């Protein structure tokens, strides 16, 4: 039986160092998040993923690869996927001459399914297990950090297009992760740089932004909360709030999958209860609030990765001191995100009928 391995960490470059192999072998580390700096070409990425799996086959290899401006791998054959707003625009476009009223919506859902398949199949062909997608935020025209990453303003359209994208991901053998619960689209501040505050009531948020999480709760395999404070619900950001993660997401909306923190190095994750906190305290807060895994980005390039080592040591110490207990259910949810079937290799994928048809459907 595996121990709960909640830490998702990054690596510095195109190949693993000895220190990184040692970190990845630690039983509290459950996965790796990749960035553009880890990319040279497909052959290098595939080799890096094999190196990671050689350390431990159960390590989850993840990436933010949504399409549009958030796509880490863009060259050497990777399809330049459109932003999710393109599918919402397709949905809202007028029917072509002679078409029925629902034709644009059908075209949009088919295109979103195709995008999910292309996205998942290309990543899996290189050894990546999971992309943190789809974005379920609503586009209010307020948030520059969300913007065209969102499908649409209407939660019904967002839900149907996200379900289509997830269907395509599933066809490729990849899971999914809806973000940023309960919604990041209404606030202007960028949580990478500041602490966004959304002053709406719980009722208003549930009726709009959080609605997709309830409608999709049976098919969402993972969720990533927003580093946003909703003071009429809780004084803590959603990712550190048991009110949001347990009472609302799990009990009220019925979500049973994995909960990832958003990046703990973001500015909005470094302030809790009116004071600055370190990575270790933020990680403990996220886990005790109901999170299954905590994501720590871009620390492998800081002082030789010492912030990661300190976080591992602090979490180990917290376990010994009884401040945190591993959760077998969390580990089951992490392992469930690992692909079950073997991936199609790149050359075979490029000539497969399903892949070529999917490419033809993209906007």
Identify the residue ranges that each predicted region occupies:
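N-terminal hydrophobic targeting/anchoring segments and the immediately downstream early-domain regions
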Residues: 1-61, 65-80, 363
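Divalent metal-dependent hydrolysis catalytic cores, especially in the metallo-beta-lactamase
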Residues: 31-37, 129-135, 290-294
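Extended, intrinsically disordered, low-complexity segments
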Residues: 317-363
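N-terminal small/glycine-rich loop or linker at the start of catalytic domains
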Residues: 1-5, 66-96, 138-147, 176-197, ...
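Short, acidic/polar
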Residues: 12-25, 112-122, 207-212, 275-285
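Glycine-rich, aromatic-flanked loop segments that form ligand/cofactor-binding clefts
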Residues: 53-80, 112-138, 158, 162, ...
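Second-shell residues forming the walls of enzyme active-site clefts
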Residues: 37-57, 61, 163-330, 343
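Glycine-rich tight-turn/loop motif centered on a GG-T
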Residues: 37-38, 80-109, 142-161, 189-207, ...
């Amino acid at each position: 039986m595996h121990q709960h391995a909640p830490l998702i960490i990054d690596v510095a470059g195109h190949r693993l160092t000895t220190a990184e192999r040692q970190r990845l072998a630690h039983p509290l580390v459950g996965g790796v998040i990749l960035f553009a700096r880890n990319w040279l070409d497909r052959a290098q990425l595939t080799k890096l993923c094999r190196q990671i799996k050689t350390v431990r086959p159960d390590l989850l290899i993840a990436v933010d690869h949504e399409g549009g401006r958030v796509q880490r791998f863009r060259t050497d054959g990777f399809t330049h996927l459109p932003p999710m707003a393109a599918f919402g625009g397709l949905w809202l476009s007028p029917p072509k001459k002679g078409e029925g009223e629902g034709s644009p919506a059908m075209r949009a859902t088919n295109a979103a399914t195709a995008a999910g398949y292309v996205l998942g199949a290309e990543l899996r062909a290189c050894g990546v297990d999971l992309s943190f997608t789809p974005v379920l935020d609503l586009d209010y025209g307020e948030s520059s950090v969300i913007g065209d990453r969102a499908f649409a303003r209407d939660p019904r359209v967002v839900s149907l297009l996200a379900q289509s994208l997830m269907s395509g991901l599933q066809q490729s053998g990849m899971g999914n992760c809806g973000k940023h619960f309960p919604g990041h689209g209404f606030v202007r501040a960028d949580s990478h740089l500041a602490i966004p505050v959304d002053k709406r009531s719980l009722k208003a948020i549930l009726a709009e932004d959080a609605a997709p999480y309830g409608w999709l709760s049976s098919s969402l395999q993972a969720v990533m909360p927003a580093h946003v404070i909703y003071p009429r619900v809780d004084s803590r950001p959603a990712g550190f709030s048991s009110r949001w993660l347990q009472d609302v997401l799990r009990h009220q909306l019925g979500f049973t999958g994995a909960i990832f923190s958003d990046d703990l190095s973001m500015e909005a994750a470094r302030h809790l209860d009116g004071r600055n906190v370190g990575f270790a305290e933020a990680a403990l807060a996220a886990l005790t609030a109901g999170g299954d895994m905590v994501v720590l980005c871009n620390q492998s390039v800081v002082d030789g990765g010492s912030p990661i080592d300190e976080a591992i040591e602090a979490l180990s110490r917290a376990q010994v001191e009884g401040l945190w207990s591993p959760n077998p259910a969390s580990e089951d949810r992490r392992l469930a995100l690992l692909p079950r079937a073997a991936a199609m290799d790149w050359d075979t994928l490029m000539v497969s009928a399903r892949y070529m048809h999917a490419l033809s459907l993209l906007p």
